[in-house]
Amino acid sequence: MMQVFSTELAEREGIYGAVIIQRLAYVIMKRKSSENHKEGYAEHKYWYTTGIMGLLRDLPYISYVHIRGTIDGLVSRGLLQKIVFKQTKERGRRPNWYTFTADGWRMLYEFHII
């Protein structure tokens, strides 16, 4: 798999931040534009439903610690919103749901990600 990121965004958010932000933006925008608009849609927002382990599978070259720290930092700085929405049928698995806040969407536009 080939992945790219904005170097300007990486200057501000670090390489891990840029890669994770662009991965989340890609999945959320893909859901928004898909024919099945209801997938990942709740509370009038599109979400990326995954856990840290899911992101680790998507981004195997970034460690668990770096993914967790980057996500927590983006949430604490108000760029991402994170919730545990509902329990799934998979043995009580409760994935996190992520979406961008208004500041996060502004950042995506500012850096021409979307």
State where each predicted segment sits.
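Minor-groove-contacting beta-hairpin "wing" of winged helix-turn-helix DNA-binding domains
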Residues: 87-100
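Generic structural motif recognizing short loop/turn segments at the entrances and edges of beta-strands
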Residues: 1, 76-78, 94-96
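Basic side chains
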Residues: 23, 68, 82, 93-94
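A short, conserved structural fragment
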Residues: 75-87
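Short coil turns linking two alpha-helices in DNA-binding domains
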Residues: 62-67
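Short recognition helix of helix-turn-helix/winged-helix DNA-binding domains
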Residues: 1-57, 68, 72-75, 102-111
